[in-house]
Amino acid sequence: MNPNKKIITIGSISLGLVVFNVLLHIVSIIVTVLVLGKGEKNGSCNETVVREYNETVKVEKVIQWHNTSVIEHIPYWNGGTYMNNTEAICDVKGFAPFSKDNGIRIGSRGHVFVIREPFVSCSPKECRTFFLTQGSLLNDKHSNGTVKDRSPFRTLMSVEVGQSPNVYQARFEAVAWSATACHDGKKWMTIGVTGPDSKAVAVIHYGGVPTDVINSWAGDILRTQESSCTCIQGDCYWVMTDGPANRQAQYRIYKANQGRIIGQIDVSFNGGHIEECSCYPNDGKVECVCRDNWTGTNRPILVISPDLSYRVGYLCAGLPSDTPRGVDAQFTGSCTSPMGNQGYGVKGFGFRQGSDVWMGRTISRTSRSGFEILRIKNGWTQTSKEQVGRQVVVDNLNWSGYSGSFTLPVEMSGRDCLVPCFWVEMIRGKPEEKTIWTSSSSIVMCGVDYKVADWTWHDGAILPFDIDKM
């Protein structure tokens, strides 16, 4: 066979094979369509699975095509029910670590926000860490000058408890340089205070949507708790301050339902000072342990009833829990009046345990370093100095900061009482260290039925960062 005939023969065979292959594909497609058409009638290939959760229903649609599964998740809102939160606080013997975010250590090479004032609050399903960002990242030029409390760049954001405040997992909550947040069992309510010092505004969000506002009534830095607000049977309560930080100011209790204010009352507290209350539910009421930034080294307390009647005074215990403070031996407690003459202060907390109290404080009397929690026998009702429990959380060689309270709801814990928990902020950078920035991380502890050994769960970041050396 001559070369030309060979080429023609090979070409003809190749063309025939191509045509045969195309016909096979057409037959395969027809058979597949017929088979899948029959399968749809008995639902063997296409099926929809519905799984229900506490707060949402997740529809999982599975489409199978030639052994390939495509899963599509379609979340939609299920209202749920209000949390009761009328149970008593559990009596606990110690506090075990719940979470630690290590945000500053991670932030030396990760995309982590510069923050302050972190706090924790829980829904029936999850606990979240809320924090006030500075609109900047660690180890970045915009972190310069973030020691400043109030700026238009500050926002309230949140992550699941234990996560660092990073840009990939954080959820925006509100524009704010002061804030509080809590869950009523159905949706999150967040309150963010922002604006100029003389005309600040608190914007209430419910389920992520702005629902109400509070305008500054005294024209002097309207501010709120910097920790969890408290919801009982669908109504949520929080405390706000407007006025000077170093003399008499004005204080109000607010009550909201589904993010709309349904009640408020002025707190009469002449000669006393209330800021940054740490509140929790207990026996159907809201109990708050606050900060006196004027004179007292003992802490103000507020006990709020659902009808907004209240009792105000000071934590009776014969040991001071604010910073700075004098020596314990020279302190005499009072249930009604500020004691000591140390101005300034730091946000703190306490938990009533019958007539006893667990109260947190820095270990240092003069600076925000170290942290311990003490149980004082009869310290809620009497000027007792008797310590019946003590636990160190951060040693005095390391920085601490603000601290505050929250509870685990019975829907989460499975117990018939509310588990008391607290967080400790660990501030790094300015003004104590040679950096251009100020930020913090936190350790979170929850009450248990056993004593827990002392240790130091300090921040641990090695400073300065690269940005501080430029």
From Swiss-Prot:
A Pfam family of this chain: Neur
Organism encoding this protein: Influenza A virus (strain A/Quail/Italy/1117/1965 H10N8)
Residues with attached carbohydrate: 42, 46, 54, 67, 84, 144, 293, 398
Keywords: Calcium, Disulfide bond, Glycoprotein, Glycosidase, Host cell membrane, Host membrane, Hydrolase, Membrane, Metal-binding, Signal-anchor, Transmembrane, Transmembrane helix, Virion
Residues the entry annotates as binding Ca(2+): 292, 296, 322
Family to which the UniProt record says this protein belongs: Belongs to the glycosyl hydrolase 34 family.
Post-translational modification summary for this protein: N-glycosylated.
Transmembrane stretches, start-end: 15-35
Protein topology in the membrane: Single-pass type II membrane protein
Cofactor(s), names only, from the UniProt record: Ca(2+)
Protein name in the entry: Neuraminidase
Region (Hypervariable stalk region) location: 32-86
One GO CC term on file: virion membrane
Notes on the domains: Intact N-terminus is essential for virion morphogenesis. Possesses two apical sorting signals, one in the ectodomain, which is likely to be a glycan, and the other in the transmembrane domain. The transmembrane domain also plays a role in lipid raft association.
Stretches assigned to the Intravirion side: 1-14
Region (Involved in apical transport and lipid raft association): 11-32
Entry-linked SUPFAM superfamilies: Sialidases (SSF50939)
Gene label: NA
Gene Ontology terms: biological process: carbohydrate metabolic process; viral budding from plasma membrane
Annotated stretches, region: Head of neuraminidase: 89-470
Intracellular or extracellular location(s): Virion membrane; Host apical cell membrane
